[in-house]
Design a protein with these regions (language model features):
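Alpha-helical substrate-recognition element adjacent to the catalytic core
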Residues: 1-77
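C-terminal cap/substrate-recognition subdomain and adjoining C-terminal extension
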Residues: 52-134
Length: 134
């Protein structure tokens, strides 16, 4: 199973601070044994250095090394371009574009998207760590 992670609104709050339980969530995902990929506008050209630099300033020192093990993705107009829809996956994102949601629905894959809503559930990442055990 591939794991895809957005950054803004998932690991970072809307004010740019680190989300509650982000370190533990990242550790659970990276240590799950599943491939983990950045799927964020901060990393859409196959280069994850910008996202790693931003998060490295905010996470615990023990988490910094985990950040570099997450694979970058490449995509242009839609994050779905970077997802292998034929393979099992889980996608953590706060707000996919409407056409991305519609495409997932048409493919019968909408349940693979996990909506992260840190505004209404600031501790949501604590509960979502269990996806690393799938």
């Amino acid at each position: 199973m591939n794991i895809y992670l957005d950054v803004d609104g998932v690991l970072l709050n809307h004010d740019g601070t680190l989300a509650n339980h982000a370190d533990e969530f990242l550790a659970a995902m990276v240590n799950s044994g599943h491939p983990v990929h950045w799927l964020t506008t901060r990393c859409r050209d196959g280069d994850s250095s910008a996202v790693v630099a931003v998060l490295s300033r905010l996470v615990q020192p023990s988490t910094v090394e985990l950040l570099t093990s997450i694979k970058p993705t490449s995509w242009a107009a839609s994050k779905l371009e970077a997802i292998d829809l034929r393979s099992p996956f889980i996608w953590f994102d706060d707000q996919p574009l409407q056409f991305e949601i519609e495409e997932l629905q048409e493919c019968g894959l909408l349940d693979r998207w996990v909506k992260v809503d840190l505004l209404s559930e600031p501790d949501q990442l604590s509960a979502l760590r269990m996806f690393g055990e799938l």
